[in-house]
Amino acid sequence: MKKHDNIYAKALNKVDDFKFDESVVDVFPDMIQRSVPGYETIVHTIGELAKSSVTPNSMVYDLGCSLGAASLSVSRAVSANTCEIIGVDASSAMVERCRRVVQTFTLPNPISIEQGLAQDVDINNASMVVMNFTLQFIPPSDREGLLASIYKGLNPGGILVLSEKVKHPTRSGNELLIDLHHQFKRDNGYSELEVSQKRAALEKVMLTDTFNEHETRLKKVGFADVVMWYKCYNFTSMVAIKA
């Protein structure tokens, strides 16, 4: 049974920067479902994309794997013994919990979970790389280099699935999307206090780009095409394809 997210339910004297610590890990499944519109659709579709993209004897990397939802989706969607999946997360608490989650299943394709920064992962022989709401937490100065490393490590025809919270290029449009997202959270039981304190906690650690900035950067490092396949409010998922 999912634990209820009430991390920001009481007024805090000081709202610290958001981090994926033990308190967040404990409530993460509830938090992500109530905060990200279409999260289940995104995770399911990552598996669907894997069916047509993951090739025999290749690697799949899930960078910023959290509790392994995307890794599990890929493992179950692809024919048995097709690939090896490596999930990587910077949070020690998340890695420890993710390993426990993964070990509870008998999986068609093996998943190993490692602790580390996405920027430090050596991508090789990859048919698919997933970053599901990860790049937005990586320092902007590191983003292009990370994407270049992913592109280099992907086999021809390989894909990067990149899901991100994005900002709209106009101020009024961006505020509209933020308002819609905040209402989505209220509809899912978060109070005004929770919404405002969570926003303050994320302000300095989650730095978003526009879709055009993502597309330009992905094409700059070599990707032949970038397809936005999902968007709701200021949340999107895209597929970058290596020719």
Curated annotation (Swiss-Prot):
GO terms for molecular function: carboxyl- or carbamoyltransferase activity; S-adenosyl-L-methionine binding. Disulfide bonds: none annotated. It is an enzyme of class 2 (transferase). S-adenosyl-L-methionine binds at Y39, G64, C65, S66, N132, R199. The keyword Cell division does not apply. Pfam families: Methyltransf_25 (PF13649). GO terms for biological process: tRNA wobble uridine modification. Keywords: S-adenosyl-L-methionine, Transferase. It catalyses: prephenate + S-adenosyl-L-methionine = carboxy-S-adenosyl-L-methionine + 3-phenylpyruvate + H2O. Its EC number is 2.1.3.-. NCBIfam families: carboxy-S-adenosyl-L-methionine synthase CmoA, PRK15451.1. Homodimer. HAMAP family: Cx_SAM_synthase. Belongs to the class I-like SAM-binding methyltransferase superfamily. Cx-SAM synthase family. Catalyzes the conversion of S-adenosyl-L-methionine (SAM) to carboxy-S-adenosyl-L-methionine (Cx-SAM). This is Carboxy-S-adenosyl-L-methionine synthase. It comes from Alteromonas mediterranea (strain DSM 17117 / CIP 110805 / LMG 28347 / Deep ecotype). The lineage of its organism: Bacteria, Pseudomonadati, Pseudomonadota, Gammaproteobacteria, Alteromonadales. The gene is cmoA.
